[in-house]
Amino acid sequence: NISLGSSATAVSTLLGTKVNITTPIVQVMTKEDFDFQDLEPAVGVEISYVKGLSGKSVMLFSRNDVRVIVSMMMGAEIPEEEFVMDEINASAIREAMNQMMGASATALSEFLGTTVDISTPISYEIDDGNAFKDKYFDGSEDSVVIRFTLEIEGKLSSEFINIMSVDLVKRLLEPFKAQFGI
């Protein structure tokens, strides 16, 4: 939540309007239990932590939410029936996520007391939900699934999902353990 507050500020600046990302709902899930049909058709955005942390963070957005964000960035409404995830739109959503996750990494750096750097985001449409789950849910390992409400003033009230490995989340929680003796 600390890092996503910074993310909301970064996206607000990019879009020129108020953006709110609500308190997360966190669940540890198996591949079999994970479902994202409410976001389909969905767009995935993956970043890798390249310094300070190890692992991937994957965000899932509905295709329509991506359309709204890209439209705002481009300054022109893109009708739903005309929106395609071509290179221009994919680049725009990567830039939005780069701003969002870059701000998140900066907040994490301060929180963890170490520099946290991320890779350039990779964005893609999810054509096969099972292949997506096979890629991001490592065998029988559980993953941490975090749902957020995304509100863009006057434009959007929706959800997005963040998926991380249990190991990555444990690393993120280490400062709490130290501070509270957990």
Predicted feature locations:
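Composition-driven recognition of glycine/serine/threonine/acidic- and proline-rich low-complexity segments
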Residues: 1-181
